[in-house]
């Protein structure tokens, strides 16, 4: 069981689970949460990349508790077991950061491949459904829990070639807002004991992308380090203030 060390901020000693921890956004988030003093439990379907991400966060912040678990988030039972195992080992869960991503698109609406929808439904919707259902109770028990989804501005202003992606992102947002309403109702007059919120970007950029395309401007893109900073900052605000909110990291369309 983990207890707060009485450190400098709300994340000191907090237990945060990160789904999709092995990608660039996941790596940056592991780093930032470890820096803030959190116990970080990352999951991913790629064990090799997950191990690299966990090792990097541990190395950057010596003494930080950062662990990784290979979890199939398309399996609800596995996802529930991950949540139960994490709460049993560390005594509570104060956050679930959902960073599972993927993209498929086409040149025009007419060329949309419905196979892309099938894939994106699994990656962008089903994993959100499973993590939210698996972690909801533990986040409320925390008293300061957060469920954070990263989404794209395109969900609010879809383009013809992005039909499947935008629709999947919009569905994931709706699901997360429904979770937020559940938190609101269960909190009653005292306000929600946990919050579900959505961080919205145009797109993400990281150092490797810049190295591969040195002349690209990536206008309006959010660096994964900026996203990680915004994620950590959500715990600085009261649950009632952020619950059910879209937190825009790019201009709202």
Where are the predicted features?
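C-terminal helical subdomain
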Residues: 190-194, 198-200, 206-207, 214-253
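Active-site loop of short-chain dehydrogenase/reductase
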Residues: 14, 63, 92-93, 139-153, ...
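Canonical Rossmann dinucleotide-binding motif of NAD(H)/NADP(H)-dependent dehydrogenases/reductases
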Residues: 4-41
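Amphipathic alpha-helical dimer-interface segment in Rossmann-like NAD(P)H-dependent oxidoreductases
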Residues: 84, 88, 122-143, 180-181, ...
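Conserved glycine-rich Rossmann-like NAD(P)H-binding loop of the short-chain dehydrogenase/reductase
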Residues: 38-52
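Catalytic loop of short-chain dehydrogenase/reductase
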Residues: 140-141, 145-191, 203
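Conserved mid-core segment of classical short-chain dehydrogenase/reductases
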Residues: 80, 101-118, 137, 161-164
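Catalytic Tyr-X3-Lys loop
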Residues: 110-129, 148, 172
